[in-house]
């Protein structure tokens, strides 16, 4: 994240100085950042910075979004809002997440990797967090 305002972080990444506020405003509203549009990113909380980074990813044109722990710095309510925004904006989303319940709730398919190999590749529907326990057992630190 650049240490500029939320607005500059969203607009400068892919279309410098040509982005109209109308393009960014729906993303800011969805991520509840409208009141921070001109705030320096350094003044934002960790969760607000993370939402700004998600906003940049949502603003980027394309059909695929890949994210590593996109909701790690926000509370559960905000995590759900962010995941709704992510999954509602891009047809293909690949997320690395450790929150098993949220992964099951928002994913169509779960792929678990253990020791560098695919240990799980199943539809998320009908799964429960305990079904994923084996992925976390005997992990080396």
Residue locations for each model-derived region?
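Conserved ABC ATPase signature
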Residues: 40-44, 48
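Hydrophobic anchor residue at the start of the ABC signature
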Residues: 54
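Conserved beta-strand-loop-alpha-helix hinge in the C-terminal portion
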Residues: 117-140
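A short, surface-exposed alpha-helical micro-motif characterized by mixed small hydrophobic
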Residues: 103-105
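H-loop/switch region of ABC-family ATPase nucleotide-binding domains
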Residues: 97-98
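Catalytic Walker B motif of ABC-type/P-loop ATPase nucleotide-binding domains
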Residues: 65-68
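Conserved ABC ATPase "signature" region
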Residues: 7, 11-36
